[in-house]
A protein has these predicted regions:
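Phosphate-handling active-site elements
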Residues: 31-36, 197, 224-238
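Short pre-catalytic strand/loop immediately N-terminal to key active-site residues, enriched for Gly-Thr
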Residues: 10-16, 196-211
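Conserved N-terminal subdomain of the carbohydrate kinase-like
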Residues: 2-9, 29-112, 264-267
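Conserved phosphate/ATP/ADP-binding segment of small-molecule kinases
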Residues: 120-196
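Short, small-residue alpha-helix embedded
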Residues: 145-146, 207-231
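Charged C-terminal helix
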Residues: 4, 55, 232-267
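N-terminal basic/disordered segments at the start of proteins
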Residues: 17-33
Length: 267
């Protein structure tokens, strides 16, 4: 019998379909994997922004994770929006029982539209409770600044701050450059396992359709890790996947605000 490489995504649901679990399932599927999910929150949102957030009870979150892992299993896990401290602790304690190596954490703190998606008291819990069991985190610049308590002013500083954040987090870091305005954006990987730095250069694509880019990158990364690729190769494949999804989706119009990327650009 054939087997899929399997990814469990633990994140919030997006009623607009562009980010969160909705984007994760599309990205993993587009990369050839099988996606299962544990929903941490239901968001009321569209391309114009987040209107409301309803947190799922922690026992239901834990139950979803156990139901998937006890039966289907997972070759990797992607973690996104966790919203509050209790959710962080629940996800960490539940996953700790399964010993999964490939855990990708996208430390979602603020939505594309500027809505807070992680309460301030949950940030320290994220560092202490979840970072120790994660293989790689994928912060953007504002998220890295919140985790470090320092300002990152330009791309030249990214290698230094990626390594600094890795020392704090105790795992590898993919620091994303998308918030800068340069023509070439260079995401930086600090591999904590090899102490090596890699840069991934991408031309900036001018488009409003950027909703869910962080979710799509981290979930495609989880898919390629589940497939058995090395960290560097998995990041390179995920970067290429997202760049194509951004470019191919740049001319589409969905809604009146920030539209999604084209997850199934290969088809």
């Amino acid at each position: 019998m054939k087997e899929y490489f399997k990814v469990l995504t633990i994140a919030g649901a997006d009623s607009g379909g562009g980010a969160g679990v909705n984007a994760d399932i599309k990205a993993v599927s587009a990369c050839g994997g099988y996606a299962a999910s544990a929903i941490t929150a239901v968001t009321v949102q569209n391309t114009l922004g987040v209107k409301a957030v309803h947190d799922i009870p922690t026992e239901i979150i834990s139950g979803q994770i156990k139901a998937v892992l006890d039966d289907i299993g997972a070759d990797s896990v992607k973690i996104g929006m966790l919203s509050k401290k209790e959710t962080v602790l629940t996800v960490a304690s539940t996953l700790r029982n399964y010993g999964i190596k490939n855990i990708v954490l996208d430390p979602v703190m603020v939505s594309t539209s500027g809505h807070s998606l992680l309460l301030p008291d949950a940030v320290e819990t994220l560092k202490k409770g979840l970072f120790p069991i994660v293989r790689i985190i994928t912060p953007n610049i504002p998220e890295a600044e919140m985790l470090l308590g320092e300002k990152i002013s330009d791309q030249k500083e990214m290698e230094t701050f990626a390594e600094k954040l890795s020392l704090i987090a105790g795992n590898s870091v993919l620091l994303k450059a998308g918030h800068f305005s340069d023509n070439i954006l260079s995401d930086v990987l600090y591999n904590a396992e090899t102490k090596q730095i890699s840069r991934y250069d991408n031309p900036k694509i001018t488009t409003k359709n950027t909703h869910g880019t962080g979710c799509s990158l981290s979930s495609s990364l989880a898919a390629f890790l589940a497939k058995g690729l090395s960290l560097e190769c998995a990041v390179e494949n995920a970067e290429n996947y997202l760049q194509n999804a951004l470019r191919e989706g740049s001319d589409y119009k969905i809604g009146s605000g920030h539209g999604p990327v084209k997850h199934f650009w290969r088809f």
